């Protein structure tokens, strides 16, 4: 895994992708830091971090689109799979390399509260706790990007899928309001999601038996639960969407 990590980290540090990612994150951070702290004199660095969470919508797809998709396109994934490193080790090595690239601008951002302390009182505890939450939020977004890069050999498709899903997570509060909270509508929605999951599994492993079994078992379990106790489905969509609302988790960090 260490060899994969070093190889991937070197590839990003010797190309424009890694530097473009870091530049964009620091550019947005600088703009909001100037607006909130330097111009408006807000004493809380958390305002800047909370305002710039949208940066992941653009920066993460750029960073992650090639990490595994390029391997599949160039057919070099076969070399990786025949290496003594496990599949989980390959994925983890690549993921940690991306997180390391992301950690570089985070280290730079860690100096901002120190700069603020020269001009007034700064709550370092809350500032660095917010920075930790921002780092974890970005790491979660990067994991999503790695997943979509793994299921396609097209960098463009991987980037688009990552953007769409991150945008959906970003707008989760608004999306949840469009769904009914009734048990029936929730059950039907979950049934559709199970079918979609089965199709995704089939597209990845090309095994109709396994994907079909997942679909049948999931749908049967859904019907049984609805018949036995339908009340558990009330407001279920909103509860599930809240779990995937990454931005709200950061705001409450």
Locations of the language-model features?
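Alpha-helical membrane-protein architecture signal
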Residues: 2-6, 88, 92-96, 124-128
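Secretory targeting signals
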Residues: 29-36, 40-46, 50-55, 97-162, ...
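Short amphipathic alpha-helical coupling elements at transmembrane boundaries
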Residues: 3, 7-11, 78-82, 150, ...
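Terminal transmembrane helical anchor/hairpin motif
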Residues: 42, 151, 158-161, 165-253
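Hydrophobic alpha-helical transmembrane segments
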Residues: 1-70, 204-205, 225-235
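Helix-loop-helix units of permease transmembrane domains in multi-pass membrane transporters
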Residues: 67-97
């Amino acid at each position: 895994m260490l060899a994969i990590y070093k190889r991937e980290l070197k590839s990003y540090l010797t190309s424009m992708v890694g530097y473009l990612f870091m530049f964009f994150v620091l550019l947005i951070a600088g703009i909001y830091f100037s607006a909130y702290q330097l111009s408006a004199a807000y004493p809380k660095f958390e305002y800047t971090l909370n305002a710039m969470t949208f940066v992941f919508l653009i920066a993460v797809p750029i960073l992650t689109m090639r990490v595994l998709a390029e391997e599949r396109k160039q057919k070099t994934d076969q070399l990786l799979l025949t290496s003594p490193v496990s599949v989980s080790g390959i994925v983890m090595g690549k993921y940690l390399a991306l997180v390391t690239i992301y950690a570089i601008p985070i280290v730079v951002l860690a100096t901002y509260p120190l700069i603020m302390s020269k001009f007034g009182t700064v709550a370092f505890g809350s500032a660095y706790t917010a920075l930790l939450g921002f780092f974890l939020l970005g790491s979660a977004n990067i994991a999503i990007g790695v997943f979509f890069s793994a299921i396609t050999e097209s960098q463009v498709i991987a980037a688009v899928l990552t953007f769409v899903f991150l945008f959906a997570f970003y707008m989760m509060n608004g999306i949840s309001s469009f769904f009914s909270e009734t048990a029936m509508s929730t059950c039907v929605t979950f049934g559709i999601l199970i079918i979609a999951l089965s199709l995704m599994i089939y597209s990845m492993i090309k095994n109709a038996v396994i994907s079909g079994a997942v679909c049948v078992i999931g749908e049967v379990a859904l019907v049984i639960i609805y018949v036995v106790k339908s009340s558990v489905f009330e407001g279920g969509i909103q509860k599930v969407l809240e779990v995937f609302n990454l931005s709200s988790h950061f705001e409450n960090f």
